[in-house]
Amino acid sequence: MPKMKSNKGASKRFKKTAGGIKFKHATKRHILTKRTTKNKRQLRPNSLLPKCEVAAVARMLPYA
């Protein structure tokens, strides 16, 4: 049986840890002058994926 392929987009965006699947928030690259300081601060830390999306991402990353 051939090896399963990982989804390359998902492998660059998500990291599996003991606590769950970690991801970085979007909209933090450029044009940040429109955003409030509070909003930028809330987007700063990495977060864990919600339970409802874990199964879908896990299917995309069979070897993670």
Swiss-Prot record:
One Gene Ontology term of the molecular function aspect: structural constituent of ribosome
Domain of life of the native organism: Bacteria
Ribonucleoprotein recorded as keyword: yes
Keywords, ordered alphabetically: Ribonucleoprotein, Ribosomal protein
Cited Pfam families: Ribosomal_L35p
Signal peptide as annotated in the record: none
InterPro entries membership: Ribosomal_bL35, Ribosomal_bL35-like, Ribosomal_bL35_CS, Ribosomal_bL35_sf
GO BP: any one term: translation
PROSITE patterns, per the entry: RIBOSOMAL_L35
GO annotation, cellular component aspect: cytosolic large ribosomal subunit
NCBIfam families tied to this protein: rpmI_bact (TIGR00001)
Record family assignment: Belongs to the bacterial ribosomal protein bL35 family.
Protein name: Large ribosomal subunit protein bL35
Record gene name: rpmI
